């Protein structure tokens, strides 16, 4: 812990917390923060190095990175490439999470009694005029286990789950994990069409590492932990299996290091690309995009963000860049062999069947924001 630094994204984020903790006092007051200067320096350098190297080709002009311990202690926060040029904190600003929102969808499914091997159709679907599509419009055209759908980030599977559960159940899970931002009360939310901060999203993933929720991201050592609820052991084990499948068999292979659990995120027209995950008690979220919301050149969460995440995680953990032990070929999960899977979708069989019309999802009251 250090004195609260000035002129940084972390300082701007921490200052309101410090003022609230100190109260009405006069004179200089020193507060101990959770910031780790060494990890902060690594985060700044790695994020900037990647964007400086690849940004022009990929049309990436901005990025953010937040690292926290599984109890919510924020140890590094990079809200942009240059604080002097722009004080807007992109780690705390709201952007679309894309497929990384599927954490909440699959948690709701597991809490409802489904398991990682429960079948879900990976076929085209249409609900009340809404027709979601997998990446590049390719599908398995059959039932696949939940773990396969999650690893491959099947969009139609996520929408089918949200339809069967009802949007209210998914929203309830997100609220329980600390998401306060507005979430669309329709099936589009299954694909992360709402907006939330990278810090809030990362804290939700931290709850899986911690085994309890909610995890509140905080900047001060004096933070009083709120009452938490432990996950059901079966639900927790299932969610961890899903996250591991993404990093070791699926769209998150670029982030594959031993002990990694995470999920890619990609939004429509490549406006936002996050990757969020953890190793041990270190939970990290990365986002790349543009302030003007212009499209990047095909950047997906399993690409540049996953590479930045891996580079930072290896540096933070003091590991070499030795390749991780990737799981057995994907076809034992009903997925293509390694190397054939694409970003946030299933690049296998082209569309061969018409969309399956479904009735409207069950309606339930949604708690107000």
Features from the language model and the residues they span:
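Non-catalytic, structured segments within soluble enzyme domains
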Residues: 1-37, 41, 73, 175, ...
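Conserved catalytic neighborhood of penicillin-recognizing serine enzymes
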Residues: 2-11, 16, 114-170, 186, ...
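Substrate-binding clefts and substrate-entry loops adjacent to catalytic sites
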Residues: 20-27, 129, 148-161, 182-184, ...
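Short coil/turn segments at secondary-structure boundaries
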Residues: 25-30, 56-62, 162-164, 172-176, ...
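A penicillin-recognizing enzyme superfamily signal
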Residues: 33-56, 65-67, 77, 82-93, ...
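Short active-site loop at a secondary-structure junction
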Residues: 58-63, 84-104, 112, 116-122, ...
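Mid-domain, small-residue-enriched loop/turn segments at the edges of structured enzyme/sensor domains
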Residues: 131-138, 166-205
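Proline/serine/threonine-rich low-complexity "mucin-like" segments in extracytoplasmic/periplasmic regions
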Residues: 333-369
